[in-house]
Amino acid sequence: MLAAAALQSAFTSCPGRIGRGSVYWPSSVTLVLQDSSDYLLTLAPYLLGRVRRGVVGSSRYAKRLREQIRLAAADSAGRAVLISGEPGLEKDNLAALIHFGSAARRQWLVRLDGATLRADGANLFGQSGSDGDWSLLECLGDGALLIDKLDQVQPSLQLSLLELARTGHWSCPGEGSRPRHFGGRVFFTAEAALPAFDQVCDLIRVPPLRVRR
C-alpha cells in the first residue's frame, strides 16, 4: 500500500510525464518495469512536478530575471545554475521554471533541502559500502538535481557538490568506491555568497520582490 501511494503521489505531481497509458521514464533508465518502479519510489519524496508560478512584474528587474531564466533554459550545455537571493523569493520555483522550460523537461526534477543533508552525502550518494547502488543520484539518471539552501550544506559536502557541478563526477562515501558520472543538470539555491561555486555555475541573482513590480 505504501509503495502504491508513493507511486500515485509521484504520478499526480508529474502530470507531464504520463501519456495515454504510458509513462515517460527517464531515457537513462533501461530496466524492467519493477526496477523502474523501485527507482521512482526512491525519487518520489523529492520530486518537483510543476512550476508554481512565473515571474511577475513589468520593471526592468523582472524583465531581466525572465531573460536570465530563458537563457538558462536554452543552454544546450546544461551548465550548473546557482540562484541566489534573500529569503522568501521562491528560488526553487525559478529552478523549476528553468528545468521545465528546457529541452530536458521530460526528465525528473528532484529537490533536496541542503540543511538536512548528511555531511558524508549519504542522502545523495548512498550509504558507505553500497558503491552508490540505488542511491538517489543513480536513480535520478539524466534527471535534474536541485540542492536548496546550498549555504546550509556542511562544508565537506559542499566540496563534493562543487565537484559534481564542475565535472559531474561523484562517488559513494567510503574507501574503494568507484567514481561515477551524473548526466543530469544541477541547480543550487542560496542566500549567502558562495564564491567557489561562482566559478563553475551560471549565476542568477534574484532581486527582491519590492523592486520587481
Show where each model-derived region lies.
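Conserved ASCE P-loop NTPase core motifs with emphasis on AAA+ ATPases
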Residues: G21, W25-V56, R60-Y61, E67, ...
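The cytosolic transmitter module of two-component sensor histidine kinases
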Residues: V51-R52, S58-A62, K91, G121, ...
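Conserved post-Walker A coupling segment in P-loop NTPases
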Residues: G54, Q68-Q127, E138-A144, K149-Q152, ...
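Conserved AAA+/SF3 P-loop NTPase catalytic/coupling segment centered on the Walker-B
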Residues: L97, G121, C139-G168, L194-I204
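Conserved catalytic/switch belt of AAA+ P-loop NTPases
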Residues: S156-H181, E191, L209
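Sensor-1/coupling segment of RecA-like P-loop NTPase cores
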Residues: R185-A196
